[in-house]
């Protein structure tokens, strides 16, 4: 989708160089269409990297998308310049009276903390409650998915004996689901987390379909029966070197971290990783935008309930 973003956003130059269709504000205003309004609540510390990864995935198809970047007001970012946040981001208070076709809630490196210990938890709960009636479909990623499952359905997360870290094969659990349209029977996705949600807890709820899982990485993609909420426990948005950067960061901190599985050729960290998840990452986001947002959301967002 051609994405409408500010002309000076750092992601614009990166995506333009990759031939992703980025539309400037002037051109967008002269197209006689209603763009999809997609908000991204960016909880990741490396906000510029994350916004670029997500914009890459929701760009370059025929529907115009207008992006609103959000960050939690109750958290001070240590890794993103305040100038960037002031220029390109809004807080929930600034958009709470608006409605959106879609919302993406990213992951965050806080999954080893109890939800209630996260300093922006109360604000996040308000945003998740607001999303039920002010957003047509919400796409939750990794810790964002765990947070939503816990808040909306009381589904707990459990600590893992060691970090789930690497690229893992997945299977389709529910065939003929539009969210997975075009997916291969076996496909790959990155995971990077210290906790998990369990199938038996999800199945007890009765309102959530498990669409995909992995023998090693566990439950991967879920959605509510109407598709208004999507939960993804991995990081399909990650680019080629994200896991490498996380691995090197943890090594530099002196943490006990194993090499990401199925990532470096021959398990040799000097060799560049081969990306085998990009196609399905693009399918996942384009299917969500097409079948669960564009084809379902009301033309007049004021009719959203």
From Swiss-Prot:
Site positions for Important for substrate specificity: 192
Function noted in UniProt: Transfers an acetyl group from acetyl-CoA to L-homoserine, forming acetyl-L-homoserine.
Active site (catalytic residues): 142 (acyl-thioester intermediate), 235 (proton acceptor), 237
Highest taxon listed in the record's lineage: Bacteria
Binding positions for substrate per the UniProt entry: 163, 192, 249
Enzyme Commission code: 2.3.1.31
Site (described: Important for acyl-CoA specificity): 111
Catalytic activity from the UniProt record: L-homoserine + acetyl-CoA = O-acetyl-L-homoserine + CoA
GO biological process terms on file: L-methionine biosynthetic process from homoserine via O-succinyl-L-homoserine and cystathionine
One Pfam entry name: HTS
The UniProt record lists the keyword Flavoprotein: no
Protein name per its UniProtKB record: Homoserine O-acetyltransferase
Broad enzyme group: transferase
MF terms in GO: homoserine O-acetyltransferase activity; homoserine O-succinyltransferase activity
């Amino acid at each position: 989708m051609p994405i409408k973003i500010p002309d000076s956003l750092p992601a614009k130059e990166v995506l333009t160089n990759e031939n992703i269709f980025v539309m400037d504000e002037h051109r967008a205003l002269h197209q006689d269409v209603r763009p999809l309004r997609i908000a991204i609540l960016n909880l990741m510390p490396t906000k510029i990297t994350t916004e670029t990864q997500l914009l890459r995935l929701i760009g370059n198809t025929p529907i115009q998308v207008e992006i609103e970047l959000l960050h939690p007001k109750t958290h001070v970012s240590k890794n993103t310049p305040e100038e960037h946040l002031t220029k390109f981001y809004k807080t929930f208070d600034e958009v709470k009276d608006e409605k959106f076709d879609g919302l993406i809630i990213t992951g965050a490196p806080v999954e080893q903390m109890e939800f209630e210990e996260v300093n922006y938890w109360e604000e996040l709960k308000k945003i998740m409650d607001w999303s039920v009636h002010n957003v047509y479909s919400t796409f939750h990623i990794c810790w964002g998915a765990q947070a939503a499952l816990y808040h909306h359905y009381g589904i707990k997360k459990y600590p893992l004996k060691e970090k789930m870290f690497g690229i893992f094969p997945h299977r389709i659990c529910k065939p003929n689901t539009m969210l997975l349209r075009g997916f291969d029977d076996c496909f790959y996705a990155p995971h990077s987390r210290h906790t998990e949600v369990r199938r038996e807890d999800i199945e007890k709820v009765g309102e959530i379909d498990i669409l995909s899982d992995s023998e090693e990485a566990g439950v991967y993609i879920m959605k509510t029966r109407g598709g208004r909420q999507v939960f993804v426990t991995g990081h399909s948005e990650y680019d080629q070197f994200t896991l490498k950067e996380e691995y090197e960061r943890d090594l530099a901190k002196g943490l006990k971290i194993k090499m990401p599985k199925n990532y470096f050729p021959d398990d040799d960290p000097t060799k560049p990783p081969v990306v085998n998840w990009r196609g399905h990452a693009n399918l996942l986001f384009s299917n969500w935008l097409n079948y669960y947002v564009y084809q379902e959301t009301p033309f007049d967002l004021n009719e959203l309930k």
